[in-house]
From Swiss-Prot:
The keyword Metal-binding does not apply. This is DNA-directed RNA polymerase subunit omega. GO terms for molecular function: DNA binding; DNA-directed RNA polymerase activity. InterPro entries: DNA-dir_RNA_pol_omega, Pol_omega/Rpo6/RPB6, RPB6/omega-like_sf. Keywords: DNA-directed RNA polymerase, Nucleotidyltransferase, Transcription, Transferase. Promotes RNA polymerase assembly. Latches the N- and C-terminal regions of the beta' subunit thereby facilitating its interaction with the beta and alpha subunits. The RNAP catalytic core consists of 2 alpha, 1 beta, 1 beta' and 1 omega subunit. When a sigma factor is associated with the core the holoenzyme is formed, which can initiate transcription. It catalyses: RNA(n) + a ribonucleoside 5'-triphosphate = RNA(n+1) + diphosphate. It comes from the Bacteria. It comes from Lysinibacillus sphaericus (strain C3-41). Its EC number is 2.7.7.6. The keyword Transcription applies.
Length: 75
């Protein structure tokens, strides 16, 4: 992956695992819904690349969750 660089992405998101999770969820959203693009121009033509470009631009960020929250799949 040449653009955006991993170093640029690490400045926005604290861990590689959070970055992968965030980008994959955003890529899935872009694939399922039309006209959800947040940037005017993308370098990548693929959804994951577009999601990573949004992270590098600071448009897509990680929202911290309350650690005491229990989800259905954790029961």
């Amino acid at each position: 992956m040449l653009y955006p660089s991993v170093d640029a992405l690490k400045k926005e998101i604290d861990s590689k695992y959070s970055l992968v999770s965030l980008a994959s969820k955003r890529a899935r959203q872009m694939q399922e819904e039309q006209n959800t693009e947040r940037l005017h121009k993308y370098v990548s033509h693929k959804y994951v690349g577009k999601a990573l470009e949004e992270v590098a631009a600071g448009v897509l960020t990680k929202v911290s969750q309350d650690e005491s929250t229990v989800y259905e799949d954790e029961i």
